[in-house]
Amino acid sequence: ARLKGMVRIRNAKNVKILGRGIIDGTDNKSNGNGRFKDEPWRLIYMENSKNIEIKGITLYNSLKWTVHPYNVSALQIDNINIVNWDYGSDGIDLSSCRDVKISNSFLRTNDDCIVVKAISFDEKMHYPNPRIQNPNIKNILVEGCTFWNMEYGNVFDIGFELRCEKISDLTFKNCDVLIQEGRGSVFTIHNSDNAIVENVLFEDIRVENADLASNSKLIDIAILFSIWSYDKFEDYEMIKKYRYNDSWDNLIPVLPGKEAFHSSHRGHVKNITLKNIQVLDGKLPYSVFNGFDKDHIVDGIHIDNMTVGGKRIKNKEDLKLYTKFTENVTIK
């Protein structure tokens, strides 16, 4: 069966979407504002729900984000296929979720393949409105999946919007990355808000090729101030004037006199492990670990048994690693 349209699940328990059918977004039209939940930019949107299972289906040609759960717990996604090519067509965006398992699935997207965020599309998106803290994120497992990331975005991405107190205990294991085509990266943490991101494990990941773009990255872990930050400029004309692309897209500078204000809204990244990572083919892209300032650092990145073309990475030079405001990096 082919469903042309979209699925919405709200304030529900014990919901299953099963079978071998297709949810097709080809005919979905947008009025241009993807921030609203009921826009057809999302093929499956869930919120404030529990015990949800999605299994066996194919999701095709999403306008933007494909599967987007917000504040969902006990979510299982197994043996699904996502095939997109439009810009911004993220695969699975886990927003403020807990106790999630994603397994045995294939994702081909033209933006982030799988993303962990803390963001609600009900909240006011900028200052001076009161900060809205989303539920914490914990216990996410992604295993046995295959990814193909096209020109935009990243393969595994935590961020940019991380508006909660803590994101912890995330595991990505036994996955294959067929290709990373654009200027993004394979392993990514972009903390653009105030959260503490800790205890993240990438294990037994095979990357066939990660260097098709000249400025692509393998590992990108950073604490940033960007157009996605909650404390960004309120005036959109200022954002357009100042934003720039460097190693990351859509950065904005900290203006003179605003250093303490923006520093107070940055978070932390600590205890991140990459174990048994294989880059099988192509040249090795560079990697970057970048804190925000001396009080908001990247702390404790552990790389254990990473190989490129069969050769083991033994030090920062082998990894082509650049660091700033970063401490306690181990490579063995």
Task: Indicate where each model-derived feature is located.
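Extracellular/periplasmic carbohydrate-active domains that bind, remodel
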Residues: 1-332
